[in-house]
Swiss-Prot record:
Lineage: Eukaryota, Metazoa, Chordata, Craniata, Vertebrata
GO biological process: mRNA processing; RNA splicing
Region (Disordered) residue spans: 1-102
PANTHER family the record matches: U4/U6.U5 SMALL NUCLEAR RIBONUCLEOPROTEIN 27 KDA PROTEIN, U4_U6.U5 SMALL NUCLEAR RIBONUCLEOPROTEIN 27 KDA PROTEIN
Keyword Nucleus recorded: yes
Keyword line: mRNA processing, mRNA splicing, Nucleus
Gene: snrnp27
Subunit structure comment from the entry: Part of a tri-snRNP complex.
Source organism per UniProt: Xenopus laevis (African clawed frog)
Basic residues biased stretches: 13-59
Similarity-based family: Belongs to the SNUT3 family.
InterPro entries cross-referenced by the UniProt entry: SNRNP27
Superkingdom of this protein's organism: Eukaryota
Protein name, UniProt field: U4/U6.U5 small nuclear ribonucleoprotein 27 kDa protein
Basic and acidic residues: compositionally biased ranges: 66-101
């Protein structure tokens, strides 16, 4: 009756050939770009490095504000160390009286004379210490009078 709407076998073959050639070209181009850059895995889980040591990132340039802060710190440090050094020497001269040679050696090695506590005393480094560590009693959840409440340990409630 009527003509079939499908193309003739010859044309179909030609078209398939041209399509495959363009696909082949595209595939080759993709392979070249893949070889240039590292091929990415398809997994979405975070990449794990083989070494467990932390990576160190160093920025080559320092922002002007950081540079200014660093200069300020450098100016402050020498003054503090000069004042602190003479104080330590004075204390060391007073502490040497009535000490044995072993105690004097310990002072030189460790930098402090005795194991005396500094609790409640004002020290140079404690100027910034404003946070208070309050230890509270532990609170536990009640499991009695509950379904499945027995034979299980008490949970700590933070």
């Amino acid at each position: 009756m009527g003509r079939s709407r499908s193309r003739s076998p010859e044309r179909r073959r030609e078209r398939r050939r041209s399509r495959s050639a363009s696909r082949e070209r595209e595939r080759r181009r993709r392979e070249r770009s893949r070889s240039r850059e590292r091929r990415r895995s398809r997994s979405r889980s975070p990449h794990r490095r083989r070494s467990r040591s932390p990576r160190r990132h160093r920025s080559s340039s320092i922002s002007p504000s950081r540079l200014k802060d660093r200069r300020d710190d450098d100016k402050k440090e020498p003054k503090e160390s000069k004042g602190g050094g003479s104080k330590e020497r004075q204390l060391a001269a007073e502490d040497l009286e009535g000490k044995t040679e072993e105690e004097i050696e310990m002072m030189k090695l460790m930098g402090f004379a005795s194991f005396d506590s500094s609790k409640g005393k004002k020290t140079d480094g404690s100027v910034n210490a404003y946070a208070i560590n309050v230890s509270q009693k532990r609170k536990y959840r009640q499991y009695m009078n509950r379904k499945g409440g027995f034979n299980r340990p008490l949970d700590f409630v933070a």
